[in-house]
A protein has these predicted regions:
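Active-site neighborhoods and metal-handling regions in enzymes and metal-associated proteins
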Residues: 1-588
């Protein structure tokens, strides 16, 4: 019997031949350049490709189909595409051509793609000369049972949870717009819109945004493109509201106005409509990444609440016989533990709960029908999880040592990961540094032993928003269109999550959230440091003390002391002794 995906691809290829196309590209995004998107936009790639991971672009030619994804997903993708004719392209690996390079080298023109799903910069990579014909194309209509766009009501963030008012945020983005000599501003990024307006939605799982476009003029005219029935009764009356689907027609009437758009975060179709585009970074993109005093205070509060949910998971794992621990039950348990707190209104991403060899797949997520159960030889359970709270967004990873015996290799790699995290967390750096400047602090410890993790060391975190937020990140290399090489500034929140991944064996990751803050000023400059704002102890069974320096051991004990102090006031009585035990001083 023919593979289901191969059959679908053959039908797509037949239609491409009729339309005179040699290739077709399906990105994993939507017209707003979202990292995660609603099913209406995501379904096309999942329909034609067996790879289940969230980040991957499909290239379909007349004689094959290729899924491009980065090192976070390679092991998962290798398993997903078995039995199909889909070919995995190891994106980022030396010698592997990018999609534009592959298209050019093989002269796959005319090329079909939806210009609403690529940024202006991404689209430009496919052109070398006028012979490279690119046609506007979409085959989403071939997908069976394509869902509608979401219709749920959006909701307002309480003013007490924000450091700025709606009027101040509008004023700030327009001031930046005027500085670039533009007369209007288009905000297509959903989290930019949510930030400026102070509203949130439920359109994308685990990401509280809503499908819309925001158009602002230098004179203060504000127009939101969204279905009006989705708005609450108290929505500001000075904001003009037009239907979501009217945005492009509206833009045709304003095309001669000098309009600021972000070339990396605005789809190419929007850019093509404007006669006088002003290309500059989105003002909201930078402004929303810097948390004010209210956001910082609230984030620390919900990080403590989050720590209690993980403490409940720790108790569950300790009380459950090892042969009864399974990934799906652990995932459901920690998800429920978070949601028990009234401030938690959603998860911040699909929980990763991975035993042993499954933990080597960085973004593996168990399901009710596809999960693993521990056995007597199991050693570890990696849990990467987070919540959306009224007051912030969390993202924490701990690797729980569940085995009766823990191998020296696992202890070594766990301790190496801890050392890597400590090294970056304790860095002092001068104003002007980006996360790319500092990434080596974490990675050098791994490199000295010939190890490396095929992903960034960390990413910015939003506030009741995207768990992955620019313009900051820790990595030593530039990732096309990731745009995370921004300068680190006080108020930024960023993760640090090094790891060791040994395919088909095990994976270890430890992840904390860091707050950038001012450290001191000297005659030579202004210096910054990090404050760890994740509160949950490490598993001492995984720590090889012979590998820790005295300074690292002191940091670990100080961190555990702080964690106990922060969590104790919130800790249920039945978990108090466990918290004290997990946080007690570690001595050589």
């Amino acid at each position: 019997m023919q593979n289901l995906f191969d059959s679908r691809i053959e039908k797509l290829q037949a239609q491409m031949r009729k339309d005179g196309l040699k290739a077709y590209v399906i990105p994993a995004t939507d017209p707003h350049m979202s990292e995660e998107c609603t099913a209406y936009f995501a379904r096309e790639r999942f329909y034609f490709c067996p790879f289940k991971g969230s980040d991957g672009t499909l290239l379909v030619t007349l004689d094959g189909y290729f899924i491009y994804t980065d090192g976070r997903f390679w092991t998962e993708a290798e398993g997903d595409i078995k039995g199909s004719s889909c070919i995995l392209m190891y994106q980022g690996k030396e010698g592997v051509l990018s999609i534009p390079q592959y298209v050019k080298q093989n002269n796959l023109y005319p090329l079909g793609l939806d210009k609403k799903l690529l940024s202006r910069q991404e689209l430009a990579a496919y052109f070398s000369d006028d012979t490279h014909e690119i046609r506007q194309a979409s085959y989403r209509h071939m997908v069976d049972d394509l869902p509608e766009l979401p219709h749920d009501k959006i909701f307002k963030i309480d003013d007490s949870l924000l450091s700025t008012t709606l009027e101040e945020r509008i004023k700030n983005v327009l001031e930046d717009t005027k500085e670039h000599n533009a007369d209007a501003l288009i905000l297509p990024l959903l989290d930019d819109i949510a930030y400026v307006l102070g509203y949130r939605g439920n359109d994308i799982p685990c990401t509280p945004v809503f499908y819309s476009y925001l158009y602002l003029t230098a004179e203060g005219e504000v127009t939101l493109f969204i279905d009006k029935e989705r708005l609450p009764l108290d929505f500001p009356s000075f904001i003009r509201v037009l239907p979501y689907e009217d945005f492009y027609a509206f833009l045709e009437t304003r095309k001669d106005i000098k309009t600021l758009i972000d070339p990396f975060r605005t789809n190419a179709y929007i850019a093509s409509l404007l006669s006088h585009p002003v290309f500059a970074p989105s003002p909201a993109f930078e402004q929303k990444s810097i948390k004010g005093p209210v956001e910082v205070r609230n984030t620390k509060e919900i990080q403590a609440i989050d720590g209690i949910a993980l403490l409940k998971l720790q108790k569950y794992l300790l009380d459950t016989p090892i042969e009864e621990i399974d990934e799906y039950k652990a995932r459901i348990f920690v998800d429920r533990a978070r949601r028990e707190n009234p401030r938690c209104f959603d998860l911040s991403f699909e929980t990763i709960a991975a035993l042993d060899d499954n933990a080597a797949m960085m973004h593996y997520a168990p399901s009710e029908t596809n999960h693993k159960t521990a056995d007597k030889n199991s050693q570890l359970l990696l849990v990467d999880s987070g919540g959306q709270y009224y007051g912030g967004t969390t993202d924490t990873t701990r690797t729980f040592l569940i085995g009766k015996e823990i191998s020296e290799e696992v202890k070594h790699d766990y301790t190496l990961t801890l050392k890597s995290q400590i090294a970056l967390s304790t860095t002092i750096f001068e104003k002007g540094c980006s996360g790319h400047s500092l990434d080596i602090k974490a990675r050098e410890i791994m490199w000295k032993e010939g190890l490396d993790y095929k992903c960034g060391t960390g990413h910015g975190v939003g506030y009741m928003s995207c768990v992955h937020e620019g313009p900051i990140g820790f990595r030593f290399y530039d990732r096309p269109n990731r745009l995370d090489n921004g300068e680190l500034k006080p108020g930024h929140i960023i993760t640090v999550e090094p790891g060791v991944y040994k395919p088909h064996k095990y994976g270890i990751r430890l992840e904390n959230n860091l707050l950038v803050k001012e450290a001191f000023t000297t005659s030579d400059g202004i210096f910054y440091s990090f404050e760890t704002i994740t509160y949950f102890p490490y598993d001492r069974r995984g720590i090889d003390l012979s590998l820790l320096t005295d300074e690292e051991l002191q940091w670990l004990n100080d961190y555990h002391k702080m964690t106990e102090e922060v969590l104790k006031p919130l800790c249920p009585r039945e978990l108090l002794s466990l918290l004290e035990d997990l946080c007690k001083e570690i001595k050589r």
